[in-house]
């Protein structure tokens, strides 16, 4: 293969992975709180209401649409774990009632404690996302299990791969999917 052919091959590979964030998981906790047996549903139907967070901000920087993106990504992880989902608004105090009204058996609340989009591929500063997931029976929201997840983008990988600026929500993959699966395991 000549030099031009190798160059085209390398650029094609870079093009395939552009816009993808490479996460460095900085913190994740195993499920804590009420045991999974205590939050089992009495029905065979398992529908998880995913309470989408509001749009995120970091200082003066606002990220329109980020709440929906995070909610959709969490829904995808729940579906990959074998559950059905329905999206609801994450209104404080009203989520459980809305979930029951929509026929949900479980409520999954998302609390984002940090969201920072620094255009890592261009700025050299890592993107960050930190969130907590809280799972409870829709009819008994006080009996909950929860996990935490924190990740930042890998600066070296982002410098080569993130040409189109992946968003912090792109850091929710791999270990995140496994963590959501662990949270949901045995909760049916």
Model-derived features: positions:
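Mature extracytoplasmic/luminal segments of secretory-pathway proteins
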Residues: 10, 16, 46-47, 96
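Sec-dependent bacterial lipoprotein signal peptides
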Residues: 1-19
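A structural "domain/chain start" motif
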Residues: 19-81, 183-188
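Surface-exposed short loop/turn segments
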Residues: 92-144, 154, 158
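Short secondary-structure boundary motifs at beta->alpha junctions and helix caps
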Residues: 138-188
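Second-shell loop/turn segments in exported
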Residues: 56-65, 120-121, 159-166
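Short beta-strand->alpha-helix linker/helix-N-cap micro-motif
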Residues: 79-99
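Extracytoplasmic/secreted envelope proteins and their assembly/folding machinery
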Residues: 71, 75, 130, 173-180
